[in-house]
């Protein structure tokens, strides 16, 4: 019995000029997601997924490598301008923005969208080391 060839649909690369880079910088990891203006994800990368494990995930260099990996993928979409949204207090905040700038993107706007509670949940107790 002859097998019928499996047909895969050819993926159409959409051209996106303006995008939004969402940077989530926690104390343990940094997540970089680049979306179009509507919020559809084009690419994402993390410090942990870039080969850093344990305490090395939470370094500025790991965040920089994650941003460079994400920028490589997004270059194929023809992205030129980026608006940056930074969330969280982590060590990868500035280095991620610098890496995106060095990758050749024109950064139009940097916004801090860190959620600040209006006296909401009780914070975790202080560490005793």
Swiss-Prot record:
GO terms for molecular function: rRNA binding; structural constituent of ribosome. Keywords: Ribonucleoprotein, Ribosomal protein, RNA-binding, rRNA-binding. PROSITE patterns: RIBOSOMAL_S11. One of its GO terms (biological process) is translation. The keyword Kinase does not apply. GO terms for cellular component: ribonucleoprotein complex; ribosome. Pfam families: Ribosomal_S11. Signal peptide: none annotated. InterPro entries: Ribosomal_uS11, Ribosomal_uS11_bac-type, Ribosomal_uS11_CS, Ribosomal_uS11_sf. Located on the platform of the 30S subunit, it bridges several disparate RNA helices of the 16S rRNA. Forms part of the Shine-Dalgarno cleft in the 70S ribosome. Belongs to the universal ribosomal protein uS11 family. Part of the 30S ribosomal subunit. Interacts with proteins S7 and S18. Binds to IF-3. This is Small ribosomal subunit protein uS11. It comes from Histophilus somni (strain 129Pt).
């Amino acid at each position: 019995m002859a097998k019928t060839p499996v047909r895969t649909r050819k993926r159409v690369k959409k051209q996106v000029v303006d995008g939004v880079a969402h940077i989530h910088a926690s104390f343990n990891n940094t997540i970089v997601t680049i979306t179009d203006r509507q919020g559809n994800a084009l690419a994402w990368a993390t410090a942990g997924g870039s080969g850093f494990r344990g305490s090395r995930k939470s370094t500025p260099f790991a965040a920089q490598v994650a941003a460079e990996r994400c920028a490589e993928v997004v270059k194929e979409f023809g992205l030129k301008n980026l608006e940056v949204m930074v969330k969280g207090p982590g060590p990868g905040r500035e280095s991620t923005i610098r890496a995106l700038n060095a990758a050749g993107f024109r950064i139009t706007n940097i916004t801090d969208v860190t959620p600040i509670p209006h006296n909401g949940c009780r914070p975790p107790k202080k560490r005793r080391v």
